[in-house]
């Protein structure tokens, strides 16, 4: 099942030095988790390994390698930067658990944004409260969720962009 053993075993043998060596991380290093989860794996020569296996409600399966994840997450990060979104900007992910959710999350982290994943079943009031309190600048969503976003737009002065990931 797992090559890491039980939780109890890992607690007994855990050592930060081993983890630092394994991850290539040294105390005080600054890392970008988005880059760390994709680009670093590719640089290690493991780009063709599977990074994500997604299964939809109709049992549709999509598989993505680390190389594909790197390209997709970099594409999102670059697009967000072209919109003049910058490090520290809050960017909401308001969508179902589709592959774009994961690409978007890592892409936001890569460009230095603050990823704000929100439960896609939220209604207008719950969505508004979170977007308003966070001063969210952009929202990445699916077309089917626009009906929840449109009625609250006029009351969200910080929200500059709505990015729809499907047709």
Model-derived regions, located:
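N-terminal presequences and immediately downstream first alpha-helices
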Residues: 1-24, 154-163
């Amino acid at each position: 099942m797992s090559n890491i053993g039980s939780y109890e075993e890992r607690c007994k043998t855990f050592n930060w030095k081993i983890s630092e060596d394994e991850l290539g991380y040294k105390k005080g290093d600054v890392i970008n988790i988005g880059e760390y989860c994709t680009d670093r794996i590719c640089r290690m020569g493991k780009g063709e390994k599977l990074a994500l296996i997604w299964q939809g409600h109709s049992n549709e399966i999509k598989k993505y390698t680390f190389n594909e994840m790197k390209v997709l997450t970099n594409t999102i990060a670059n697009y967000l930067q072209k919109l003049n979104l910058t490090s520290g900007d809050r960017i909401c992910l308001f969508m179902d658990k589709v592959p774009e959710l994961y690409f978007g999350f890592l892409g936001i982290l890569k460009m230095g944004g603050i990823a704000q994943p929100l439960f896609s079943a939220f209604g207008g009031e719950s969505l508004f409260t979170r977007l308003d309190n966070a001063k969210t600048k952009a929202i990445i969503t699916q077309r089917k969720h626009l009906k929840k976003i449109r009625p609250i737009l006029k009351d969200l002065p910080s929200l500059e962009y709505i990015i729809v990931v499907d047709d």
